[in-house]
């Protein structure tokens, strides 16, 4: 597929401090065939004025205007997805910064995929570097690249290895995902699971996004959720609910192996079961011994 038009979705809310830098990083991409669709979620600061300014400055930027009010982070992105018509859609946070070749690298990856892969739900994602509020790199990789390169392992049940602002999905994935299931709490995790069950996940082993950490960004501000994810709380309750809901909704579409994996996962994460029994069952998944031992402690 040559020179595909990309759609970038940005959900904004009170982002006046950093959003100009992110918009500029998108405008300065080496790959130029894109459009940026933004929906503001009721900002109380100067975010909307900044968006209006950029919309006038670049015809590829479109600000959605509706009367739906504040939907919250997740529903804001869902609303944006309903307005995405292009074959390939990327997600942008308002406070990150994209390296200028990010889109170029994604298009290069698309060009190397065969028709069969492109005809199914597809998720392509890269890595990011963790930065402070001045975009100085604190850590070169946000995602464990060794884990992310694992394509045929069932370890994804217990690992968060997809970050929304580094992700791109195709139209097949969007059709599969919306409206969001009731138990979706993180859209990136949702797309990750759907790609594993129904399509393909492709990892670009480069940090093409500067992921800015500060006191007000969506994940960074939610300390309890960040702790559960980054400290690898292996039985994150909401994740279990989502996987169970996917099983119930798509039972007839899931492959036999995936159904078996889900059943094992639900057994291992069933807190009503004996911990030693769950530890024994956990050998089915490719987890290190230390992680399996955490079953006995955190389960």
Residue positions per predicted region:
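C-terminal subregions of glycosyltransferases and related glycan-biosynthesis enzymes
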Residues: 157, 178, 184-185, 197, ...
């Amino acid at each position: 597929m040559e020179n595909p038009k990309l759609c970038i979705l940005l959900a904004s809310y009170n982002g006046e401090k950093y959003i100009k830098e992110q918009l500029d990083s998108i405008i300065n991409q080496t790959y130029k065939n894109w459009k940026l669709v933004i929906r503001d979620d009721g900002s109380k600061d100067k975010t909307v004025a900044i968006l209006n300014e950029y919309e006038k400055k670049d015809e590829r930027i479109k600000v959605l205007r509706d009367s739906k009010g504040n939907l919250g982070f997740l529903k804001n992105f869902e609303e944006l997805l309903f307005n995405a018509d292009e074959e390939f859609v990327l997600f942008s946070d308002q406070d990150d910064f994209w390296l200028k070749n990010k889109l170029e690298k994604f298009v290069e990856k698309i060009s190397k995929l065969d028709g069969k892969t492109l005809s199914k739900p597809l998720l392509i994602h890269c890595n990011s570097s963790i930065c402070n509020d001045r975009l100085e790199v604190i850590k070169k990789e946000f995602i464990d690249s060794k884990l992310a390169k694992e394509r045929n392992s069932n370890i994804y049940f217990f690992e968060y290895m997809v970050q929304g602002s580094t992700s791109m999905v195709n139209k097949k994935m969007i059709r599969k995902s919306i409206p969001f299931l009731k138990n979706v709490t993180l859209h990136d995790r949702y797309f990750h699971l759907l790609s594993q069950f129904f399509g393909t996940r492709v990892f670009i082993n480069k940090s093409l996004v500067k992921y800015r950490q500060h006191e007000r960004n969506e994940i960074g501000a939610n300390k309890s959720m960040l702790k559960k994810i980054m400290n690898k709380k292996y039985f994150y309750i909401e994740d279990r609910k989502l996987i169970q809901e996917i099983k119930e909704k798509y039972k007839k579409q899931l492959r036999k192996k995936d159904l078996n994996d889900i059943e094992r996962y639900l057994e291992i994460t069933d807190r009503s079961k004996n911990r030693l029994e769950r530890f024994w069952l956990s050998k089915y998944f490719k987890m290190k011994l230390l992680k399996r031992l955490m079953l006995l402690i955190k389960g």
